[in-house]
């Protein structure tokens, strides 16, 4: 009965996009973790990806009337929302292109922007953080599915919730599908942390140019997306999309 239920909840597409594959998610998550460590450790303790910390610090400094410091956290927030808008514009404008997927355009734009960040000196940290936040927002808006499940490649809270939920369900039902789902999320979380660890170490060796390693990881994802593969799409993914990717 469980297998019959599972059959109804899973759809297979023979011409899937590698942008939704686990392999692509690996490189995006490594890059996402590296970006966050880069801006926090090297660019003035600003979170480029998860904006919750920036909102907290912005609010605190506004309350204390530290306007210069408040601006320090407001700029990446503004850049993030603009990045989401631009990614959506790219999707609507280039979704019907056949030669290249619109998500590849997002990745290529992100690579070029992050490459430029590597040339910015430390006295331009505010600009560097703005560009990284903008790029991150494009990525999180464009890549919201992994093997048919909703996920985020630049932050962990939604992935942790979904991974734990699936693990709890597996312990109750012993359904291997939910175990596979949970493991996918925990692997992505580990890879994000691994990327952050690499980024945090590399800044002491490569300085501003550490962000170029993120570019290299994204470039792998860019070329992977020329491949087509069969993917699964799960009905619960549609429910998750509303919550996970936006957290």
Where are these regions (language model features)?
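Alpha-helical transmembrane segments of multi-pass membrane proteins
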Residues: 2-247
């Amino acid at each position: 009965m469980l297998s019959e239920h599972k059959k109804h909840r899973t759809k297979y597409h023979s011409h899937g996009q590698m942008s939704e594959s686990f392999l692509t998610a690996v490189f995006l998550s490594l890059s996402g973790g590296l970006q966050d460590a880069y801006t926090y450790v090297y660019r003035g303790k600003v979170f480029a990806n998860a904006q919750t910390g920036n909102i907290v610090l912005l609010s605190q400094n506004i309350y204390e009337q530290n306007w210069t410091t408040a601006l320090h956290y407001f700029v990446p927030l503004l850049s993030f929302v603009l990045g989401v808008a631009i990614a959506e514009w790219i999707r609507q404008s280039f979704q019907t292109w056949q030669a290249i997927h619109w998500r590849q355009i997002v990745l290529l734009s992100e690579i070029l922007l992050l490459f430029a960040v590597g040339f910015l000196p430390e006295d331009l940290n505010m600009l560097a953080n703005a560009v990284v936040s903008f790029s991150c927002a494009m990525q999180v808006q464009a890549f919201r599915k992994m093997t048919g499940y909703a996920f985020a490649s630049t932050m962990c809270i939604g992935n942790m919730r979904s991974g734990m939920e699936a693990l709890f369900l597996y312990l109750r039902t012993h359904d291997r599908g939910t175990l596979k789902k949970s493991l996918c999320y925990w692997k992505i979380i580990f890879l994000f942390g691994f990327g952050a660890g690499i980024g945090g170490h590399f800044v002491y060796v490569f300085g501003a140019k550490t962000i170029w390693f993120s570019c290299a990881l994204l470039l792998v994802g860019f070329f992977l997306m020329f491949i087509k593969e069969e993917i699964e799409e799960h009905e619960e993914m549609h429910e998750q999309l509303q919550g996970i990717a936006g957290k």
